[in-house]
């Protein structure tokens, strides 16, 4: 399979994403160097590893001592990891639906709990599964999304969970809403609320919850006081920064994903001729145009129409007119040697030029998280370690 794709990549492969596993490994090492020695890392690999591929990343990190495990958003994401042989703990950050409770418990996948009915249903499922359900209690300290409140009512909930013999409270956590901002006032307030709540659990209930965690990617970079027992590394795992307001000097990161295609057609249009739907671009002079076989059907944003660019031979080629579902056109007038079959860089480096997810996010009215997460299944993921292809995920591998 790898040799077959390598052959296509060297000729006319329509589009592919290359994932540099060495970059992800280096990012993890640099993050670990910035947190307390005893603090472990939970790699957040929801949305299929932010579009990078959750399974290959989990496999690479599986035997690393400082890794606690992984976080998913849904049971289905977590189940895929277990099916792939991943053994480390997996935490589901969002809501889990009752239909999956029994199987989830058997697979030792940890749900977040913050509703009494969920606790009762999990206890029933645990009895059927014949083993305890390990859970993490979610506390809302200011995100306003899900979680118990850090007050008397929340304290009653913690006691309620602890009283169920079928449940084992492994962890408790909260999530910062503004830790990616330069001003950490809000995040520090959330941290204070969370710490005070933990103190009350210990002093008033006499309970010690083993794994306490609140740091997300931004807090890993700029809030060492929030390390606790574990931190959750999300976007930083993949070499992207949470915002432009966080310090990029403390933890050096390297983007793991590049996106490539090939030119499939070249032609010259003349003054007065238009390109793509709606004729939004009309040439004012002879213009050399190349067609790229990628579009919004692949997750390449339509909002890059007339704004974005690609790299060919290390030079910028601006997008002409609208991005179509499966194709878009670029101006190669300034790249005389460009021809059909040439490699095209949509994300990543070519020579001295580089297109970043941050730039594409800004140009398209999105942001870096969204760009990488929404790249579709029509795009094969090619994994490299030490410069060599080690794995390929192609949803259409039989073609």
Regions found by a protein language model. Name each.
Residues 34:
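Conserved PLP-enzyme active-site core in the AAT-like
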Residues 11, 15-18, 23-26, 37-213:
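Active-site-proximal beta-alpha core segment in soluble small-molecule metabolic enzymes
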Residues 2-25, 76-77, 96, 114-121, ...:
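Active-site anion/phosphate-binding pocket segments in diverse small-molecule metabolic enzymes
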Residues 31:
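Class I S-adenosylmethionine-dependent transferase superfamily signal
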């Amino acid at each position: 399979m790898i040799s077959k794709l390598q052959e296509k990549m060297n000729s006319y492969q329509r589009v592919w994403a290359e994932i540099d596993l060495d970059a992800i490994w280096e990012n993890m090492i640099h993050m670990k160097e910035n947190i307390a020695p005893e603090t472990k890392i939970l790699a957040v690999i929801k949305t299929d590893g932010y579009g990078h591929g959750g399974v290959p990343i989990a496999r690479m990190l599986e035997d690393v001592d400082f890794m606690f495990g992984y976080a998913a958003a849904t049971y289905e994401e977590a189940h895929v990891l277990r099916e792939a042989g991943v053994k480390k703990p997996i935490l589901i950050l969002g809501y889990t639906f009752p239909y999956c409770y029994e199987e989830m418990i058997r697979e030792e996948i940890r749900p977040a709990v913050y509703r009494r009915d969920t606790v009762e249903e999990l206890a029933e499922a645990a009895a059927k599964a014949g083993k305890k359900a390990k859970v993490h209690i979610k506390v809302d300290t200011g995100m306003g999304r899900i979680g118990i409140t850090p007050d008397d009512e929340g304290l009653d909930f913690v006691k309620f969970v602890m009283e169920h013999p079928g449940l084992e409270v492994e962890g408790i956590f909260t999530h910062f809403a503004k830790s990616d901002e330069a001003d950490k006032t809000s995040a520090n307030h959330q941290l204070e609320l969370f710490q005070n709540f933990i103190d009350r659990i210990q002093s008033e209930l006499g309970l010690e919850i083993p794994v306490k965690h609140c740091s997300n990617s931004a807090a890993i970079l700029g809030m060492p006081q929030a390390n606790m027992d574990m931190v959750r590394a999300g976007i930083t795992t993949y070499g992207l920064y949470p915002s432009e307001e966080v310090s990029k000097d403390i933890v050096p990161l390297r983007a793991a994903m590049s996106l490539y295609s090939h030119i499939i057609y070249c032609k010259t249009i003349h003054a007065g001729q238009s390109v793509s739907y709606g004729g939004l671009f009309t040439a004012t002079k002879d213009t050399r145009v190349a067609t790229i076989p990628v579009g919004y059907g692949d997750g390449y944003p339509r909002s890059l129409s007339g704004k974005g660019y690609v790299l060919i031979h290390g030079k910028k080629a601006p997008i002409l007119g609208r991005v179509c579902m499966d194709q878009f056109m670029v101006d190669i007038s300034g790249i005389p040697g460009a021809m059909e079959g040439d490699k095209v860089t949509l994300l990543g480096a070519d020579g001295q030029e580089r297109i970043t997810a941050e730039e594409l996010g800004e140009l398209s009215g999105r942001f870096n998280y969204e760009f990488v997460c929404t790249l579709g299944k029509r795009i094969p993921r090619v994994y490299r370690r030490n410069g060599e292809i080690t794995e390929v995920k192609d949803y259409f591998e039989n073609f």
